[in-house]
Amino acid sequence: MRMCLLVMLCVLVMGCQQATEQTQFVGTDITGADFGNTLKLTDHTGKPRQLSDFKGKAMALFFGYTHCPDVCPTTMADLAHAMKLMGKRSDEVQVLFVTLDPERDTQQVLAQFVPSFDSRFLGLYGTPEQIAETAKNFKVFYAKQEQAGKSGYTIDHSAGVYAFDKNGKIRVYIKFGQKPEEIAHDLELII
């Protein structure tokens, strides 16, 4: 009888452990963070946007720029791949790309760049002041680095993605380099 109870207890503990593992984010859990609560920009279709426009959908918010040689296109491609992996559930997620380069990333440039990864993705832009205010609100670092050459400059910037649940609450910081399968996992947990 004792052996039977011991075996049942072990099975119960293992079951609880598996349930816990399945509900943990791969990215950094930032549930309850007191930043990243305001955004007022314009999307690449010309429509004014704020975070509350997307309530009812999970959101993945990335700050970057279209002339970025590596981090930005890689992150956008990884987000697009994650959306494909999610199948129909991806309809419950809105991906937002906020430009950190309002000088070059016009509405027209964003309208070509952002949907090239997934037609549902939205690019957001604003004045340099609006971008600075939004980046500060999300604790995003960015700095223009002058360079010789055709583009004239690059922008050093934070490289993670902020994920919000359907209630508009910030939940996860998805680190640069997280695999599409891991991104999909984290997004599915907050849908």
Positions of the model-derived regions?
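Short, hydrophobic alpha-helical segments
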Residues: 190-191
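Sec-dependent signal peptide recognition
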Residues: 2-7
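Short active-site neighborhood of thiol/selenol oxidoreductases, capturing the structured segment around
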Residues: 51-73, 79
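Structural microenvironment flanking redox-active thiols in thiol-disulfide oxidoreductases
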Residues: 74-134
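C-terminal motif of bacterial Sec signal peptides marking the signal peptidase cleavage site
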Residues: 12-15
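Thiol/disulfide oxidoreductase modules built on the thioredoxin-like
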Residues: 130-186
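N-terminal "domain-start" segment that seeds a small globular fold
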Residues: 20-52, 77
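Short loop/turn microsegments at loop-to-beta-strand junctions
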Residues: 36-37, 59, 158-160
